[in-house]
Amino acid sequence: TGMHAQFARQIDFEGGQYGQALLSRWPLADLVIHWLPGEPERERRMVATCSVQLPGKQLLFGTTHLHHNNADFRLRQARAITDSFVDLPATIILAGDLNAEPQHPPVVELIKSWSVVHSATNLRTFPVDKPSKQIDYIFYRPSDRLRIVSSEVIAEAVASDHRPILAVLEWVE
């Protein structure tokens, strides 16, 4: 692919590993795993972050996948995400499967401290064959450093059970 990658393992699964992956056309460094509240004896949830090596800019990129069948854990995980990153001086982009629709508490909680890339449109991403739910998001902070150029759901149904979101953001100078 010609892309740079980092992988954060969550669990061993069926002879391999399951976790969060980050891909970038820019070099990635300093992979950090931020464990989220939940059920440690099951699939532990996390935010995986990397520094994106951009010329003259400081960007932290993260990915997450919140708990799928426990609303209380999802809300606690959203709060932990904000608590972990709210005081950092870096520009941060966070993408992931929140397993929650826009009106649900985890999304409402994150929007208190983060800007969401696609708040003006309903970008349904799940299930992949006939998307009827918006549960995947791209957030960023602080809001005055990036400008949204575009965002869209890509009609691709092979790589995942979710459709991907493509967003173009640019630095505000």
Region roles according to the model:
Residues T1-Q58, R145, S150-A155:
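Structured beta-strand-rich core segments of catalytic domains in phosphoester-bond hydrolases
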Residues K57-L60, T91-I92:
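Charged active-site motifs of nucleotide-sugar-dependent glycosyltransferases
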Residues G15, N69, N99:
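Glycine-/small-residue-rich active-site loops that bind phosphorylated ligands and cofactors
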Residues S51, D72, R76, F85-I93, ...:
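Metal-dependent phosphoester-hydrolase catalytic domains
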Residues V32-E39, T64-D72:
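Surface-exposed cleft-lining segments at the edges of enzyme active sites
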Residues T63, A95:
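Generic enzyme active-site microenvironment
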